[in-house]
Swiss-Prot record:
Disulphide linkage map: none
SUPFAM superfamilies hit by this protein: Ribosomal protein L29 (L29p) (SSF46561)
GO molecular-function terms, A-Z: structural constituent of ribosome
Similarity annotation: Belongs to the universal ribosomal protein uL29 family.
GO biological process: translation
Keyword Coiled coil: no
Assigned keywords, A-Z: Ribonucleoprotein, Ribosomal protein
UniProt-listed Pfam families: Ribosomal_L29
Name recorded for this polypeptide: Large ribosomal subunit protein uL29
GO-annotated cellular components: cytosolic large ribosomal subunit
């Protein structure tokens, strides 16, 4: 997900996206802990997507 795509969304949509990503991160961490996660790169991808969403939310809050 690109930051440019996120900037076109409203704050409510970004909040929903953030909640969705946090749930996905939790599920991936649980799968990793139980040894069921083969694609460990997804953890890094989701973590960075969360950071992008939070950054855009903070930018919108400052406007």
């Amino acid at each position: 997900m690109k930051a440019a795509e996120l900037r076109n969304k409203t704050q409510e949509e970004l909040g929903d996206e953030l909640i969705s990503l946090l749930k996905e991160q939790f599920n991936l961490r649980m799968r990793k802990a139980t040894g069921q996660l083969n694609q460990v790169h997804l953890l890094r991808k989701v973590r960075r997507d969360i950071a992008r969403v939070k950054t855009v939310l903070n930018q919108k809050a400052g406007e």
